[in-house]
Amino acid sequence: MEILHRAGEADAVIMAAAVADYTIDGGPQQTKMAKDRPTLTLTLIRTVDILAELGRWRGSREHPVLVGFAAETHDLVSRARAKLQTKAVDLVVANDVSRADAGFEVETNVATIIDQATATEVPLGSKRELARLVLDRVGSLLSQRPSATQISPVGSHDSS
């Protein structure tokens, strides 16, 4: 996966959303489907969870800082904490999408920024302000870790 190589060169990886959780089993059809069937059944299969793969790849290394997002309608903190653990990331930004004035198709958001120790509620505000807060947290995490330049990129080996 190319992203694993590129992640080795990054100080932080912020994955705003899954590209798709599912895809059609067998991929695109090579021929046009006839319209003579009264019903059609599609079988969907899970796609690779790129953020979880990054978390597994990183393992115990401290770089890059990994940030994921979770669009939730209830139990924001508990569901985001579960993602923090299962995906092995440093931060999860849990967006409360149960409100009409926050989340999708509006310029405002309500979120909770969650790490291993804290859950910081972010009140209704602009998405730009939320992004600034997330980047501030990433910067804080980076300042507490050894420089990424001291870590060999993926695929390189010390021959000494």
Q: Can you say where each PLM-predicted feature lies in the sequence?
A:
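Small-residue (G/A/S/T)-rich helix-start motifs and N-terminal tracts that mark the onset
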Residues: M1-A12, V89, D96-S160
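Glycine-rich phosphate/dinucleotide-binding loop and adjoining beta-alpha-beta core of small-molecule
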Residues: M1-F104, T112
